[in-house]
Amino acid sequence: MTGLFDPLTVRGLTLRNRIGVAPMCQGTSTDGHVNDWHLVHLGARALGGAALVMFEAAGVTPEGRISTRDAGLWDDAQIEGYVRVNRFISAAGAASAIQLGHAGRKSSFRPIWAAQGMQGLRVATSAEGGWTAAGPSAIPFDTDTAQPRAMSDEEICAVPAQFARAAQRAEAAGFDWIEVHAAHGYLLHSFLSPISNLRTDGWGGSFDNRIRLCLETARAIRAVWPERKPLAFRLSYTDWVEGGWTLDESVELSRRLREAGVDLIDASSGGTTPAATNLARHMTTRALDGQARGREDGALRAQIPLGPGYQVPGAEAIRSGADILVAAVGLITDPTQADAIVREGRADMVMLARELLRDPNWPIRAALALGQAARMSIPCQYYLAWSDRGGSRFDPVAPET
């Protein structure tokens, strides 16, 4: 029976275990360039035993970033910074991944550490480097976010090529794995959801029209991304609101993504509307007869059943319904819990976020807790810290020269 510390092979890449570092925006980049923070932040998690170490969402255009301080991969000049970090991740025995994204209407924010009060991220001013956000329709995410403009057909048609060019840069930077961000209300997800996509042309309305941009993006990336390297998509499998994107739709989209060359679905949820904990009211704007008319949807907000492993059922449904590899993510914090998710066939791997922020060495501790220390590579430089805890396999990590 496959467990958390069994290797996982996807195309030509074999991961040393089934623990991944989920992408987490750090708000530390300047003009999209990664720096020493990313080297230390991600390098520590590679040394801590994770098999897949994923960079934060990198904007495929400057306007595709969530915040003004997020990473990017829209310019060749940004490649070298990633190369340096990837060399260290590889030396530590992990595989490097990058999440490529376009934030769409949920962009041009101040970095999360600069947000004021309890209402979430604030829109960056032009003086702070902000821009006018754009999405499928002119519908703001919330009352404290700016109203985006609706994208033109020409702008939408350009998106797959923007992702493909970023994928080529990811290859030049030495990445082993690409994940496309099609979740959390960002651009690709906003086309999927009827809540945020009110278009009446070939990009909206029917299911086939709403998934069109996702599929075209997947095909464009697969055409330039090496055949031996995995391609994943992060999906929000439900919006958690009536009339939104559904699990059944996610299963069908996952089938079609698999046919387009996608290897794994990173199954998350939500993000199209504010969560119930956000006190702001959700507003939508519908273009009707050429006039922009406001429509208040009352307290339209996601009712998310937060709890340990709350998104695992969605991952399991996609795995069985679409016959594709899946990663489970969301409030996975306990080694026994994570191991059971894999052993019970509910997911093929787990992605940890905040738990790995709290403890970069969580994989090592999990291996010890599960009696799998012999299968965990621990840096020999840390021998004294782990030898008396049951660690038995130590590998050197060569410093950069």
Language model features with spans:
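Flavin-dependent oxidoreductase catalytic cores
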Residues: 1-401
